[in-house]
Every structure is written in C-alpha cells, then in structure tokens.
Amino acid sequence: MRLILSLPVLVVVLSMVLEGPAPAQAAGEISSTFERIPDKLKEFGNTLEDKARAAIESIKKSDIPAKTRNWFSEAFKKVKEHLKTAFS
C-alpha cells in the first residue's frame, strides 16, 4: 500500500523539480538578460563593421570593379554601334 501511494508522490515531486524555477524566481535572470542586450548589440555591431570593412577592402584590392566597368563600357559601345547601323 505504501508503494502505491509513494509512486504518485514521487512523480509529482519529479515534475515539480524538472519544471524549473517559478516566474517570480526567474525575474532576476530576465532583468540581467535585458541588461546584457546593449553589450551584445554593440559586440554584434563591431563584428559586423569589421567584416564589412574587410569585404570592402578585398573588393577594392581585386580587379572585379575594373573588369565590370570595362565589360559595361564595351557592351554599351556595341549597343550604340548596333543602334547607329540600324537607324542609319
């Protein structure tokens, strides 16, 4: 008889323990999380800034902008010549 009564009590106690802290107890953790948000945002912004600067520098050092500019100017010249011959 005692075993039958102790098993439901054990289940209830385990469910209470595994449930975690009550909302009133967790309030301190939430406030500390909100206090850390500006620091995390600043860290994220600095990381993003560093990565953006590195990407811009690598683009500046590569020859992709010059090749793109040359390709567009050649394509524009071809279209211009084609239109001249078509409407002349």
UniProtKB/Swiss-Prot annotation:
Entry keyword annotation includes Plastid: no
InterPro entries hit by this protein: ApoC-1_sf, ApoC-I
Signal peptide: 1-26
Gene Ontology MF term list: fatty acid binding; phospholipase inhibitor activity
UniProt keyword list: Lipid transport, Secreted, Signal, Transport, VLDL
Tissue expression profile of the protein: Expressed in the liver.
GO cellular component terms, A-Z: high-density lipoprotein particle; very-low-density lipoprotein particle
Pfam families assigned: ApoC-I (PF04691)
Subcellular location: Secreted
GO biological process entries: lipid transport; lipoprotein metabolic process; negative regulation of cholesterol transport; negative regulation of lipid catabolic process; negative regulation of very-low-density lipoprotein particle clearance; triglyceride metabolic process; very-low-density lipoprotein particle clearance
Role played: Inhibitor of lipoprotein binding to the low density lipoprotein (LDL) receptor, LDL receptor-related protein, and very low density lipoprotein (VLDL) receptor. Associates with high density lipoproteins (HDL) and the triacylglycerol-rich lipoproteins in the plasma and makes up about 10% of the protein of the VLDL and 2% of that of HDL. Appears to interfere directly with fatty acid uptake and is also the major plasma inhibitor of cholesteryl ester transfer protein (CETP). Binds free fatty acids and reduces their intracellular esterification.
Family, as annotated: Belongs to the apolipoprotein C1 family.
Protein known as: Apolipoprotein C-I
Organism from which the protein derives: Canis lupus familiaris (Dog)
Taxonomic path: Eukaryota, Metazoa, Chordata, Craniata, Vertebrata
